[in-house]
């Protein structure tokens, strides 16, 4: 087996050396020129995401914690998981009023409160890197301070989107944020609540992840 393997690899190397492949530079002109106006970007994102059951709520930089709290109270949420080490988490802690859903800090390894996360958390709040007009997608950048489980496990995912953090294309997101120089373990592109058509090819939402995706547009 060893001789056969060596022979095959030697043959492949010889073929590669005898027929080198010329590298062709990529042409990103189409992506560079695909543009929408500022107002049109947000309307396009909303239209495309609402088509797959995403919900939108408007807020301002001053009142978004109160808007989120009121929305979750009306939705019947009892517990809200958040990342205390983030800027958004600090705002929640300082602004959260009594009488609303209970804030639950995500400041422990998941193994220490796995059961609570999967059975006792109603909503999770995350920041976003922005949204893409071309595809109608949110961009999440998970980190040690804000792990991806915040957006994947709770039944309701609250995503905070700053109205000026809008991009035309995924290519623009990657280039302007210099992804080539360093990426997290994973970046998430989210267009709506979880869905599947595995069962009799019937489309169903909220089967293996959040049942609702709420985008809070912060103007």
Where are these regions (language model features)?
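The feature marks the mature, well-folded catalytic cores of soluble enzymes
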Residues: 1-219
């Amino acid at each position: 087996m060893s001789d056969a393997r060596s022979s095959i690899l030697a043959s492949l190397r010889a073929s590669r050396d005898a027929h080198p492949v010329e590298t062709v530079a990529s042409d990103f002109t189409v992506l560079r020129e695909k543009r929408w106006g500022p107002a049109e970007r947000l309307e396009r994102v909303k239209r495309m995401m609402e088509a797959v059951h995403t919900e939108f709520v408007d807020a301002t930089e001053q009142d978004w914690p109160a808007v989120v709290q009121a929305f979750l109270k009306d939705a019947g949420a009892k517990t809200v998981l958040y990342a205390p080490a983030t800027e958004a988490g600090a705002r929640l802690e300082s602004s959260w009023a009594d009488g609303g859903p209970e804030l639950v800090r995500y400041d422990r390894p998941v193994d220490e409160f796995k059961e609570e996360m999967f059975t006792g958390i109603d909503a999770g709040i995350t920041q976003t890197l922005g949204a893409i007009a071309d595809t109608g997608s949110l961009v999440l950048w998970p980190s040690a301070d804000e792990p991806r489980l915040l957006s994947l496990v709770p039944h309701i995912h609250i995503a905070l989107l700053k109205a000026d953090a809008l991009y035309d294309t995924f290519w623009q997101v990657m280039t302007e944020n210099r992804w080539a120089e360093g990426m997290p373990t994973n970046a998430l592109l989210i267009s709506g609540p979880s869905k599947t058509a595995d069962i009799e090819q019937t489309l169903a939402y909220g089967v293996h992840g959040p049942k609702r995706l709420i985008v809070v547009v912060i103007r």
